[in-house]
Amino acid sequence: MLEKTTRMNYLFDFYQSLLTQKQRSYMSLYYLDDLSLGEIAEEFDVSRQAVYDNIKRTEAMLEEYEEKLVLLQKFQERQRLVAKLKQLISEEEHVNEEMKQVVEAIEKLD
């Protein structure tokens, strides 16, 4: 569950501008503020089921956006490559060819 929450938070960060205000509000309250479905329903004066349905549809939309735009995947790959590059730089013996390959891989992501 924590892994899903983390993923949804990342997807929300990347794609929230593509969502409606209501979708942003529900997702923010549910995932960022950790409110329950019932608490969100009470705040918006709708049923718990309406909140649940909206959040599930929004989650599916975020996954669809990621499938098409792969912003999160590229971000994670960049993070991995930057960490590897930092490790290589910090080592006593610099492996120039390997560092060049990492830099090229980062450049290809953008």
UniProtKB/Swiss-Prot annotation:
NCBIfam families: PRK00118.1-4 (NF001068), PRK00118.1-6 (NF001070), YlxM (NF045758). Belongs to the UPF0122 family. Gene3D superfamilies: Winged helix-like DNA-binding domain superfamily/Winged helix DNA-binding domain. InterPro entries: RNA_pol_sigma_r3/r4-like, UPF0122, UPF0122_fam_protein, WH-like_DNA-bd_sf. It comes from Bacillus cereus (strain ATCC 14579 / DSM 31 / CCUG 7414 / JCM 2152 / NBRC 15305 / NCIMB 9373 / NCTC 2599 / NRRL B-3711). Coiled coil: none annotated. SUPFAM superfamilies: Sigma3 and sigma4 domains of RNA polymerase sigma factors. This is UPF0122 protein BC_3844. Might take part in the signal recognition particle (SRP) pathway. This is inferred from the conservation of its genetic proximity to ftsY/ffh. May be a regulatory protein.
